[in-house]
Amino acid sequence: HNQPVGTWSDDTSMALATCDSIRATGRVDMRDMRERFVRWYREGAYTVSGLFDIGGTTADALSSGCGRAGERDNGNGSLMRILPLAFTDATDDEVRAVSAITHAHTISCEACVRMVHVARRLAAGEGPHDVAGSLTGVPESEVRSGGFVLSTERAALWCLANTSSYAECVLAAVNL
């Protein structure tokens, strides 16, 4: 996308909007989050220098005001921005509702719930291998990294299960 060093992604911008909404409202408020997502989309809020990338499902949902629920609307957009909810008392239903602002299909919503649970377990002191152990030793060649939410979820868990440090995990994720 030919962006300057230090520019963060659309997913990070939406995660920042999520954090800002929780900070401002003191709770998980889907209407406020959606409004902040729309400000990001239309005005470049939460960016370094304006919007430069957006997934099709996210763009359609923010333009229409309705989360996309088709089988082909299971991109990884909501999964990539859901982490802030792990550090709140958000219920599984609230996690699903936050996903559904843009990605309303059950596959996307449930992937978000699972990832919030993973992050909460890690924050509670469980080790990465305990949380994602079923993927320990799976060859990298069997891990697909792409835009589909389940591929992204599996890739993230594979990185946790097959690395031993933060730096190694991030590098593995980048190189998938």
Model-predicted regions and their roles:
Residues 1-176:
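Structured, active/binding-site neighborhoods that engage oxygen-rich ligands
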